[in-house]
UniProtKB/Swiss-Prot annotation:
It comes from the Eukaryota. Prolines at the third position of the tripeptide repeating unit (G-X-Y) are hydroxylated in some or all of the chains. Gene3D superfamilies: 2.60.120.1000. PROSITE patterns: NC1_FIB. The modification Allysine is found at K84. The lineage of its organism: Eukaryota, Metazoa, Chordata, Craniata, Vertebrata. It comes from Bos taurus. This is Collagen alpha-2(I) chain.
Length: 1364
């Protein structure tokens, strides 16, 4: 909407142009003048209307460097003109022919006119011949990572890997049923091996077994094919200001920008010496005739004054916009294969694999020798039924059975697995050229081609007829501001201008002495305006008076006729970079450049973080069952170890004949998961054919290119539990590597602080005033002087109102596919952001259903009333959890000390009245209650958030660029995107050093005198002339009449900042702004004091998704938009609120990661009941997450298990003293005085002690076991004496000693007792201690008694301590 000032300016422009037209008509019809001489050759006519866009030309080769451009306008000359100059005015009427005038003397050449506006582009010329390929460009910056390539074909099976390290011993199994006592048998001699039996007939498949427990998490699947492009996401929030990009090549000179806001008034500089005389001003109005002075003598010209001192450096401009993105660099050669990475953390649980084929029955093992007879024991009570034993090893393959009767036709089988992908065939031979097709329909108008290289200058054309004024072209995009030039030296005076009309010669006056500068008198009041006087006789030309003050800027006059083009000036010195111009409109997408030459191979980058897990691959074919191993003794069940490396699949066996139908076997166990097959293209579903026998393996083909990582193979059969070996010694440091190649130039460093402003230089001495020169003829009005240097950058203006969306442009052609860019370097993790402000209090959620009543506990003593907690942030409504199993009743705690009074909290909501309970006495220890019935199944949980990205796989070799695809059809017009929010203002750059002054230009040749032109319209008012010498004091004139009120002047510069005003009253609360950018994870706050339990609420509706409890247009972004209702800040506030809501949800549902740890494994199980057991991060003491610890969470029992460091104390003849038979503490005496430690990598011992203390407070049950490996040493019961005198002693955390017999609270139990007699062989005893006093664990030391002999050795394995 036009403002009042804009409307008034338009009206004045219209009136001025109308007056100018009328004045020219009157002058033309006044009198007929004589015929003039033949006029000079006219300018080239205006360009014709624009032609249709031609087809895209082939990109030409880089042209030769162009000639030096014309000198740019100095300073902010362009700022004095509007961005679009007026077109030529309408052609005037032809006046009557005047009488021939006398030929005037040819005037000297005028100043070079400013360059005219660029005309509309002409029609596109025909496409030039394809030039030779240009030189290879510089290597571009790394492109964005390309899409992952298709997985390679499956490689040849690798060799058998080395045997893995033995796993840690597992937790003890359940105690088996005691068998009946056998009769005492005599020890028989071992029998000879029996003859190998005939293979039995293969049995029929057994009934399917029960569904097995959830398997361990599968390995990360191979990356799936890229999905279809998703819909355009909403505009992201404003990112942080990126680092300044490299300085781009200088863009083409932009159109003159609109005049910027006037800068603030700069400080007054030191006065420089007088410069050379400026151009002559306009002829002033005739002055009053002064008194005739005595004639003076002409003086000689004075010497030019000394050059003024250099001014202070100007303020550096804001950083420029990032340059255009470079063309993609050439594809680098494949880097060397990186070293194998460390084993990653176990991934989340994979889905259960399908059952494998049933293995063949194993052969019957040889009978073992009978064992020694045991003493007859008391018959034990019947134990629980043990778990099914492991299946025996498969038997040898049986002979083929007799051929059965043909069976009935079976149903069609399921579709077989897809075959492996065939090798890519060689490229076919190029076929012969086809016949010419018939001419096609005329295509759509192609986009505008590239501008061709400038042609040779043609001969001057004949003067064409003056064309109609062309339609104003659309304003082009605002180009980037050119670099700011250094002010050049003041050039020589230009050639003399054309002589003006001769004035009457004034009488020569005497030169008066230079008077001192008088003080300015006070301004007189304006008198009333007098009547206009009669026109007086033209007086003699007075001396040039002092230059008047600058007038207001006049309205732009009508455009004059264009002058002849001046000679191109020499190329100026490149100036400093100017302030960045506003961003130009987005240009059309250019065609991709040709690929550059391949760059050198870059150094191998550091291993990036692992990517997100891909989808599961197809199931592979099952491998052949391996040969049976000898059955080892079953070890104790341990914690699940880290997943081992995959075994290689065996070769495929031949297909056997169909056997006789056997009896129904017992339910089989889940088969092993097959190796992943290569992803084949889906074929049509056919009926299953008979399976052919496998042919012999062909010779190994040449190694193919490295494929993408396949799925992880099957887990091989577990080997026997070995003992962990001692840690190897540290290796010698490697030799110093060769010096690497010089790295690429780093990014610009941060801007240093602005240096102090240098002191102003001293003023040069004033030159002696020269004697007055003789009076010259009055010159014509001089051309507009060069504009002054640019003022300092003004404060940024307010944001303009968004313009209406432009019409959609035509769809561009699809560009050629660029080569795949190199993988970008991995960015470093951002630092944790500051904690965000607390969110708004949520509305009260609907009440939940009443829970099932728990068993009544024994009444505890009445505790002291705790301090009221702070009002917490509203939590999101949780889903209904599974009802928990009722826990056993704990012992009553002692009366706690009264805590300090808390700060006064806000008043809470009024609770429902509670039931008055009578204070009961402290009860005795109750027996543990029975387990409650299992709760109903909860509703399925929502899909979890996307996990943290896994470690990045090894860098694959760069794929070859694909062939050029066909040109796609013209796309539909896209919708105009929403305008993005304004970017943040970048930091001010540092003050650059002053560049050297340019060399003085060569004086130009004097031009040919031109014909006298018609009298021009009055020019713009010139700049102030130099201060003249003070004239003789004139007589005081009569007071003039008051003048009419002039028009309002242009807005003055901003005044200096006034003193700060008083604080205003607090305004109304603003509307809620948009959400800001999501902050990083805030640190965990300290736990508040527990509040009193509230009454159960009424039942709520079944849980759906989380609903944010604000109704309607609470966010301003949801309200109907009006031009004044929305500000950029509002979006940030809205985004901040939404981000805070997300963060609160994250706090309420911890993820078990290092950045978002849970407090205990129980919290994780409650938040994610669908998760499986594994290693997770917890932070029992809450607060900062830097001291979070990694533990094993057993979700089946809800236990949190922490491993000892180290877990194994190696084998040794620890102690040599067979005489002193006393308990010797391993950690205190034998092991160098160090107790068992429970540390986690990255956490100090003190921090770990704090975490363990919190774990003990949070738990009400703890357990731990220790395996005592012995050779000729008694650990628990001595079989010879039948007593426990030689049993070991354990030391708990609170210095309590745990013994084999005595008080039941401090006695441990033994699960396996192999160290009960001395057999000169290694045995083991597994000791377990469970307690409902978690402060007693973990175990810190062990003291055996039966050690010290030369043949006695022990080794310890400390199991994890588990809290519940």
């Amino acid at each position: 909407m036009l403002s009042f000032v804009d409307t008034r300016t338009l009206l004045l422009l219209a009136v001025t142009s109308c007056l100018a037209t009328c004045q020219s008509l009157q002058e033309a019809t006044a009198r007929k003048g004589p015929s003039g001489d033949r006029g000079p050759r006219g300018e080239r006519g205006p360009p014709g209307p624009p032609g249709r866009d031609g087809d895209d030309g082939i990109p030409g080769p880089p042209g030769p460097p162009g000639p030096p451009g014309p000198p740019g306008l100095g300073g902010n000359f362009a700022a004095q003109f509007d961005a679009k100059g007026g077109g030529p005015g309408p052609m005037g009427l032809m006046g009557p022919r005047g009488p021939p005038g006398a030929s005037g003397a040819p005037g000297p050449q005028g100043f070079q006119g400013p360059p005219g506006e660029p005309g509309e582009p002409g029609q596109t010329g025909p496409a030039g011949a394809r030039g030779p390929p240009g030189p290879p460009g510089k290597a571009g910056e790394d492109g964005h990572p390309g899409k992952p390539g298709r997985p390679g074909e499956r490689g040849v099976v690798g060799p058998q890997g080395a045997r893995g390290f033995p796993g840690t011993p597992g937790l003890p199994g359940f105690k088996g049923i005691r068998g009946h006592n056998g009769l005492d048998g005599l020890k028989g001699q071992p029998g000879a091996p029996g003859v190998k039996g005939e293979p039995g007939a293969p049995g029929e498949n057994g009934t399917p077994g029960q569904t097995g427990a959830r398997g361990l998490p599968g390995e990360r699947g191979r990356v799936g094919a890229p999905g279809p492009a998703g819909a355009r996401g909403s505009d992201g929030s404003v990112g942080p200001v990126g680092p300044a990009g490299p300085i781009g090549s200088a863009g083409p000179p932009g159109f003159p920008g609109a005049p910027g806001p006037k800068g603030e008034l700069g400080p007054v500089g030191n006065p420089g010496p007088a410069g050379p005389a400026g151009p002559r001003g306009e002829v002033g109005l005739p002055g009053l005739s002064g008194p005739v002075g005595p004639p003076g003598n002409p003086g000689a010209n004075g010497l030019p004054g000394a050059k003024g001192a250099a001014g202070l450096p100007g303020v550096a401009g804001a950083p420029g916009l990032p340059g255009p993105r470079g063309i993609p660099g050439p594809v680098g050669a494949a880097g060397a294969t990186g070293a194998r990475g460390l084993v990653g953390e176990p991934g989340p649980a994979g889905s259960k694999g399908e059952s494998g084929n049933k293995g063949e029955p194993g052969a019957v093992g040889q009978p073992g020798p009978p064992g020694p007879s045991g003493e007859e024991g008391k018959r034990g009570s019947t134990g629980e039924i043990g778990p099914a034993g492991p299946p025996g090893p498969p038997g040898l393959r049986g002979n083929p059975g007799s051929r059965g009767l043909p069976g009935a036709d079976g149903r069609a089988g399921v579709m077989g697995p897809a075959g492996s992908r065939g090798a890519t065939g060689p490229a076919g031979v190029r076929g012969p050229n086809g016949d010419s097709g018939r001419p096609g329909e005329p295509g759509l108008m192609g986009p505008r081609g590239f501008p061709g290289s400038p042609g040779n200058i043609g001969p001057a054309g004949k003067e064409g007829p003056v064309g109609l004024p062309g339609i104003d072209g659309r304003p082009g995009p605002i180009g980037p501001a050119g670099a700011r030039g250094e002010p050049g030296n003041i050039g020589f005076p230009g050639p003399k201008g054309p002589s003006g009309d001769p004035g009457k010669a004034g009488e020569k006056g005497h030169a008066g002495l230079a008077g001192a500068r008088g003080a300015p008198g006070p301004d007189g009041n304006n008198g009333a305006q007098g009547p206009p006087g009669l026109q007086g006789v033209q007086g003699g030309k007075g001396e040039q008076g002092p230059a008047g003050p600058p007038g207001f800027q006049g309205l732009p006059g009508p455009a004059g006729t264009a002058g002849e083009a001046g000679k191109p000036g020499e190329r100026g010195i490149p100036g400093e970079f100017g302030l960045p111009g506003p961003a130009g409109a987005r240009g059309e997408r250019g065609p991709p450049g040709e690929s550059g030459a391949a760059g050198p191979t870059g150094p191998i980058g550091s291993r990036g973080p692992s990517g997100p897990p891909g989808p599961d691959g197809n199931k592979g074919e099952p491998g052949v069952v391996g040969a049976p191993g000898t059955a080892g003794p079953s070890g104790p069940s341990g914690l699940p170890g880290e997943r081992g490396a995959a075994g290689i699949p065996g070769g495929k066996g031949e297909k056997g004949e169909t056997g006789l139908r056997g009896d129904i076997g017992s339910p089989g166990r889940d088969g092993a998961r097959g190796a992943p097959g290569a992803i084949g293209a889906p074929g049509p579903a056919g009926a299953n054919g008979d399976r052919g026998e496998a042919g012999p393996a062909g010779p190994a083909g040449p190694a193919g290119p490295r494929g993408s990582p396949g799925e992880r193979g099957e887990v091989g059969p577990a080997g026997p539990n070995g003992f962990a070996g001692p840690a190897g010694a540290a290796g010698q440091p490697g030799a110093k590597g060769e010096r690497g190649t010089k790295g690429p130039k780093g990014e610009n460093g941060p801007v240093g602080p602005t240096g102090p402003v240098g002191a102003a230089g001293p003023s040069g001495p004033n030159g002696p005033p020269g004697p007055a020169g003789s009076r010259g003829d009055g010159g014509p009005p001089g051309a507009t002087g060069f504009p002054g240097a640019a003022g300092r950058t003004g404060p940024p203006g307010p944001s303009g109102i968004s313009g209406p969306p432009g019409p959609p442009g035509p769809a561009g052609k699809e560009g050629l596919r660029g080569p795949r860019g190199d993988q970008g370097p991995v960015g470093r993790s951002g630092e944790t952001g500051a904690s965000g402000p607390p969110g708004f209090v949520g509305e009260k959620g609907p009440s939940g259903e009443p829970g099932t009543a728990g068993p009544p506990g024994t009444p505890g003593p009445q505790g002291l009333l705790g301090a009221p907690g702070f009002l917490g942030l509203p939590g999101s409504r949780g889903e209904r959890g599974l009802p928990g199993v009722a826990g056993s009743v704990g012992e009553p705690g002692p009366l706690g000390i009264a805590g300090p009074p808390g700060a006064r909290g806000p008043p809470g909501n009024v609770g429902n009245p509670g039931v008055n309970g009578a204070p009961g006495e402290a009860g005795r220890d109750g027996n543990p209650g029975n387990d409650g019935p299992p709760g109903r199944d909860g509703q399925p949980g929502h899909k979890g958030e996307r996990g943290y990205p896994g470690n990045a796989g090894p860098v694959g070799a760069a794929g070859a660029p694909g062939p050029q695809g066909p040109v796609g059809p013209v796309g539909k017009h896209g919708n105009r995107g929403e305008p993005g929010p304004a970017g943040a203002v970048g930091p001010a750059g540092a003050v650059g050093p002053r560049g050297p002054s340019g060399p003085q230009g060569i004086r130009g040749d004097k031009g040919e005198p031109g014909d006298k032109g018609p009298r021009g319209l009055p020019g713009l008012k010139g700049h102030n002339g130099l201060q003249g010498l003070p004239g003789l004091a004139g007589h005081h004139g009569d007071q003039g009449a008051p003048g009419a009120v002039g028009p309002a002047g242009p807005r003055g510069p901003a005044g200096p900042s006034g003193p700060a005003g008083k604080d205003g009253r607090i305004g109304q609360p603003g509307a809620v702004g948009p959400a800001g950018i999501r902050g990083s994870q805030g640190s965990q706050g300290p736990a508040g004091p527990p509040g009193p339990p509230g009454p159960p609420g009424p039942p709520g509706p079944s849980g759906g998704g989380y609903e944010f409890g604000f109704d309607g247009d609470f966010y301003r972004a949801d309200q109907p938009r009006s031009p004044t209702s929305l500000r950029p800040k509002d979006y940030e506030v809205d985004a901040t609120l939404k981000s805070l809501n997300n963060q609160i949800e994250t706090l309420l549902t911890p993820e078990g990661s290092r950045k978002n740890p849970a407090r205990t494994c129980r919290d994780l199980r409650l938040s994610h009941p669908e998760w499986s057991s594994g290693y997770y991060w917890i932070d029992p003491n809450q607060g900062c997450t830097m001291d979070a610890i990694k533990v094993y969470c057993d979700f089946s029992t809800g236990e949190t298990c922490i491993r000892a460091q180290p877990e194994d104390i190696p084998v040794k003849n620890w102690y040599r003293n067979s005489k002193a038979k006393k308990h010797v503490w391993v950690g205190e005496t034998i092991n160098g005085g160090t107790q068992f430690e429970y540390n986690v990598e990255g956490v100090t011992t003190k921090e770990m002690a704090t975490q363990l203390a919190f774990m003990r407070l949070l738990a009400n049950h703890a357990s731990q076991n220790i395996t005592y490996h012995c050779k000729n040493s008694i650990a628990y019961m001595d079989e010879e004496t039948g007593n426990l005198k030689k049993a070991v002693i354990l030391q708990g955390s609170n210095d309590v000693e745990l013994v084999a017999e005595g008080n039941s609270r401090f006695t441990y139990t033994v699960l396996v007792d192999g160290c009960s007699k001395k057999t000169n062989e290694w045995q083991k005893t597994i000791i377990e201690y469970k307690t409902n006093k978690p402060s007693r664990l973990p175990i810190l030391d062990i003291a055996p008694l039966d050690i010290g002999g030369a043949d006695q050795e022990i080794r310890l394995n400390i199991g994890p301590v588990c809290f519940k």
